[in-house]
């Protein structure tokens, strides 16, 4: 997946009918003979002219401030991952998930919950992702099996489905063989 960063376009290009400056401001900016100061830029010009101290103590303080900001950011991210881990069902319950596992399971769980919303919890096998993949009749009609969510897969491996699955085995992309009942 490629992402492209686009530079913002000037407002005058996007909205040619709208002027950026009022007529008074345009007249002021066009007059080169004006020696007046409007007060908006005096402080900024004065600040630019003041040389900055770049001594070793200033550099150390800047580095310490940057380190403190990074620690706060890292702590915030870790707190968010901890909160997300508490919302994702895992087996065993006390299993510690890495960050990438947490993100992958969260994505899978969201897909599972979306299937539950679309198909309802009343699926006869308790696994809405199988119904979404193979249709309500359960026949494949020559279709390739697609990936299923981790939660239906886990339920399937535990034998959580209510049907007798017999010996019908299908290979799901990137996953060990699954037993899926055909009607």
From Swiss-Prot:
Record-level GO cellular component terms: nucleus
GO MF annotations, alphabetized: DNA-binding transcription factor activity, RNA polymerase II-specific; E-box binding; protein dimerization activity; RNA polymerase II transcription regulatory region sequence-specific DNA binding
GO biological process terms on file: cell differentiation; developmental process; negative regulation of hematopoietic stem cell differentiation; positive regulation of stem cell differentiation; positive regulation of transcription by RNA polymerase II; regulation of transcription by RNA polymerase II; stem cell population maintenance
The protein's name: Transcription factor 15
Highest taxon above the source species: Eukaryota
Function statement: Early transcription factor that plays a key role in somitogenesis, paraxial mesoderm development and regulation of stem cell pluripotency. Essential for the mesenchymal to epithelial transition associated with somite formation. Required for somite morphogenesis, thereby regulating patterning of the axial skeleton and skeletal muscles. Also plays a key role in regulation of stem cell pluripotency. Promotes pluripotency exit of embryonic stem cells (ESCs) by priming ESCs for differentiation.
Record's keyword terms, sorted: Activator, Developmental protein, Differentiation, DNA-binding, Nucleus, Transcription, Transcription regulation
SMART domains the record matches: HLH (SM00353)
Transmembrane segments: none
Regions annotated as coiled coil: none
InterPro entries per UniProt: bHLH_dom (IPR011598), E-box_TF_Regulators (IPR050283), HLH_DNA-bd_sf (IPR036638)
Gene: TCF15
Taxonomic classification: Eukaryota, Metazoa, Chordata, Craniata, Vertebrata
Main location: nucleus
């Amino acid at each position: 997946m490629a992402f492209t960063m686009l530079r913002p376009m000037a407002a005058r290009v996007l909205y040619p009918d709208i002027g950026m400056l009022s007529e008074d401001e345009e007249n002021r900016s066009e007059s080169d003979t004006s020696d007046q100061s409007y007060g908006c830029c005096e402080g900024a010009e004065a600040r630019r002219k003041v040389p900055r101290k770049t001594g070793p103590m200033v550099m150390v303080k800047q580095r310490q401030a940057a380190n403190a900001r990074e620690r706060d950011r890292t702590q915030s991210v870790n707190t968010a991952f901890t909160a997300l881990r508490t919302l994702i069902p895992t087996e065993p319950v006390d299993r510690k998930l890495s960050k990438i596992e947490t993100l992958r399971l969260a994505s899978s769980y969201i897909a599972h919950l979306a299937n539950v919303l679309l198909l309802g919890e009343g699926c006869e096998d308790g696994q809405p992702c199988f119904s979404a993949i193979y249709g309500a009749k359960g026949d494949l009609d020559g279709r390739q099996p697609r990936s299923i969510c981790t939660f239906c897969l886990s339920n399937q491996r535990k034998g959580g489905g209510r049907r007798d699955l017999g010996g019908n085995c299908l290979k799901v992309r990137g996953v060990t063989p699954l037993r899926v009942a055909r009607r």
